[in-house]
Structure formats: structure tokens, C-alpha cells
């Protein structure tokens, strides 16, 4: 593990100061990414507020962030273009080394990407917990904005105790001959669903962190992963058809 990912608003807007206080000697050794876009009064992509947040982040951390990500711009899609231009300018001015976009659900951004500069990074949800429509939208979004790197996040949607991890045989997604826990298999699939070069995960346990790191070394079964995507799309299509039929029936009897 060589990276740390945080955000301006994490830990009650105190995450940067907390990191600087508990690990001042270690921070320079990590590739540090943070996010801006949330403020005490809510989500805002105003360029001046974003600049102030980035400047405050560097001051609180005692160093400039390696990467600054625009935090969930789907909450304010109309502000995406000027916000991206502002972060790109901040990178060029030395307030960070790279900039990018992190989005939990890129579907609202489909028609908001026309005028934005190409980001260095896009971070998206990956893995078995992501709905098929969100996976397709994430791939479409990265195709449109053409980042240099694509990172993943939230492979367990914040809950490793979800019944999914005990009721589904996640070993089916791995190449044959590998032994793994469900969590490790979840990590492996998150690196390939869709393909990402880095994966951000949250943990408060060293044992859990070691388990997650082991999962990153596993190889997935390409045929199974492809079949899974096909099934996701078929399921979505059936769901849309059923919804349409119910709506048509309701309209005809209204």
C-alpha cells in the first residue's frame, strides 16, 4: 500500500488535520489523494470555494496533495465544466500534482462532459455491488472524458457483512486453482469490473487491510467476468421491459 485517499469533508472536516497530527513523518512517503466539493452547508462546485478548499487542504496537511478529485459532481452537474477548469488551473499553478473526478453515480453527468478538460484521474465504483447500469455509465463517462488513469473505490459499498459475501460463491469469479476468502475475491473482481489501476478501500483493522491487499494479487476468470456483464445487461433489460409493461397497463386502466 503506497497511497492514502481522504477528503476535505471526512471526519467532520478534520481529516487533513488529523492525518498531519498523527503521521507527520509518514505523509511525505505516501501518494496522497483528497476530494473537494462538500462544505458544511452542503455540496458546491463554485470554483472559488473549491480553490479555498484546496488551499486549506494543503495548509492542514502540511504538503500539497498529489491528486485533488472533484467530489461527486453528479450532485451539482451544472457546475461540472467550470469546476473542472478550476481544478485543472490549480494543478498548473502547483496547488496539486494531478486532478480528477470521483463519482458515485456518473449517470447524471452523461450530458455535462462536453467542455471539460481531460482529467488526470477518474475514480468510480467498481466490483460486484455496483448495478449494471452504473457500470455501463462509468465506462461511458471515462470514454467521454478520457482520463490518463482510472481508479476504483467502494468494492463492498461500505459493508463487508452484506449477505452477498456469504450467499454468493465469489470463487467462481476467480481463475481456477486459487484459494481466497469472499472478501479477497471481491477485491480481485473490483480491479476488473471495470478495469482500474488502483483501488481505494476503507478499513480500521490491520488484519482486514492485509486480507484486502492479498486479494489484489488474485487473477479473475475473464470468461466468467464477461458472462456476468452480459447477465447484468439482460437483467436490466428485463427490468425495464417489465416496468414499461406495468406502466402501460396502468395507463390503459387509468
Q: Where are each of the predicted segments found?
A:
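Acidic (Asp/Glu)-rich catalytic clusters
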Residues: 19-31, 55-63, 89-91, 112-117, ...
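Beta/alpha (TIM)-barrel catalytic core signal, keyed to glycine-rich beta->alpha loops juxtaposed to Asp/Glu
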Residues: 9-12, 72-254
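A short, structured active-site edge motif that brings together acidic residues
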Residues: 28-41, 70-71
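Glycine/small-residue-rich loop that forms an oxyanion/phosphate-binding "nest" at active or ligand-binding sites
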Residues: 43-56
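Glycine-centered flexible beta-alpha turn that most often forms the glycine-rich phosphate-binding loop
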Residues: 4, 65, 99
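N-terminal binding-site loop/beta-alpha segment at the start of enzyme catalytic domains
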Residues: 1-30
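Active-site groove signature of glycoside hydrolases
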Residues: 58-77
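Hydrophobic beta-strand scaffold residues
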Residues: 3, 32, 148-150
